[in-house]
């Protein structure tokens, strides 16, 4: 089963509605006393200005701690951020670990914003972004030491193709790091499913998909309580304020934003709503000599061509 043009259009419309513009981000920074032309990456992601993952920047810290238990990326590592959005998670990774990050997203306006924000924060040399489909990536096999995918898989119908591509671009022994919601999705998700495509396998189904693609499951850490607490806090602020604020969700019109938040709160508070961190390792099919990691580049490109 493949993702349809209708799925893509619905997703684009959804994220266009909740994504802040560069001007809106600059205004929020100035209101906080930060010069948007000379800002640090953390001054963006700590205010949730460039993150769309569930739980925002607090969840990024949790993810980094879990990865630190296994194999934290280092300065020589290249990490792929699937569904990078505005690039906040990637800049967080550069800030935290000193690695390099390549981000892909199917929505051009988000890639443009990600590039602009990396330029503003001086991270243009450690981050790069391109428009690409997660199920049809143009990177060589084994190009990345880690693939991060935060609350993105739930929007992709073609799960088998998705995880096959992730396994293909991971080097042997490389890590898949993902955060997502598992199914079956309860009726409380109906308002969200009207807005955007949602396809959530159960946790056993998700593990089978990951392992069937050639990866070995390492751990699953439930995060439902953390995410629910975050959304409850945002809902309170949305009620008390006018609806405008620093996070992407609060840029939605007040009524629409409240309805979407309520759907998530009801879902995560039910027996059917679960979110969690999954780590898996690419099965080592053969040994790889030290220092032989490939730089990510388009298939067919020669070394030294760049990109």
Region locations from a protein language model:
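N-terminal auxiliary segments of SAM/dcSAM-dependent transferases
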Residues: 1-30
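Conserved alpha-helix/loop element of class I SAM-dependent methyltransferases that forms part
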Residues: 53-75
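Class I SAM-dependent methyltransferase SAM/SAH-binding core
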Residues: 78-82, 86-136
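A short acidic, Gly/Pro-enriched loop at the edge of an enzyme's catalytic core
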Residues: 135-147
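A short SAM/SAH-binding and catalytic strip from SAM-dependent methyltransferases
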Residues: 146-158
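A short glycine-rich, Lys/Arg-flanked "PGG" loop and its adjoining helix->strand segment in the class I
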Residues: 160-175
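Short, glycine-/aromatic-enriched active-site segment of Class I SAM-dependent methyltransferases
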Residues: 178-198
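Conserved Class I S-adenosyl-L-methionine
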Residues: 221-303, 307
């Amino acid at each position: 089963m493949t993702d349809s043009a209708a799925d893509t259009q619905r997703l684009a419309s959804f994220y266009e509605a909740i994504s802040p513009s560069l001007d809106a981000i600059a205004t929020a920074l100035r209101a906080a006393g930060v010069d948007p032309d000379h800002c640090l990456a953390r001054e963006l992601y700590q205010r949730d200005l460039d993150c769309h993952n569930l739980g925002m920047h607090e969840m990024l810290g949790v993810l980094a701690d879990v990865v630190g238990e296994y194999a934290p990326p280092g300065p020589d590592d290249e990490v792929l951020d699937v569904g990078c959005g505005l690039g906040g998670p990637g800049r967080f990774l550069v800030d935290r670990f000193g690695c390099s990050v390549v981000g892909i997203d199917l929505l051009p306006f988000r890639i443009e914003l990600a590039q602009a924000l990396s330029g503003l924060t001086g991270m243009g040399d450690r981050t790069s972004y391109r428009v690409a489909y997660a199920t049809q990536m143009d990177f060589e096999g084994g190009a990345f030491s880690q693939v991060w995918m935060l609350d993105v898989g739930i929007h992709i119908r073609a799960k088998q193709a998705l995880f096959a591509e992730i396994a293909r671009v991971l080097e042997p022994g490389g890590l898949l790091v993902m955060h997502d919601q598992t199914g079956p999705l309860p009726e409380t998700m109906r308002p969200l499913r009207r807005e955007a495509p949602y396809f959530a396998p159960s946790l056993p189904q998700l593990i089978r998909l990951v392992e069937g693609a050639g990866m070995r499951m390492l751990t699953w850490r439930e995060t439902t309580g953390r995410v629910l607490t975050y959304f409850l806090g945002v809902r309170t602020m949305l009620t008390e304020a006018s609806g405008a604020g620093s996070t992407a969700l609060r840029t939605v019109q007040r009524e629409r934003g409240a309805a979407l938040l309520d759907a998530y709160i009801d879902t995560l508070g039910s027996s059917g709503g679960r979110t969690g961190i999954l780590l898996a390792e690419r099965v080592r099919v053969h040994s790889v000599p030290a220092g032989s990691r490939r730089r990510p580049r388009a298939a067919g490109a020669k070394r030294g061509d760049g990109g």
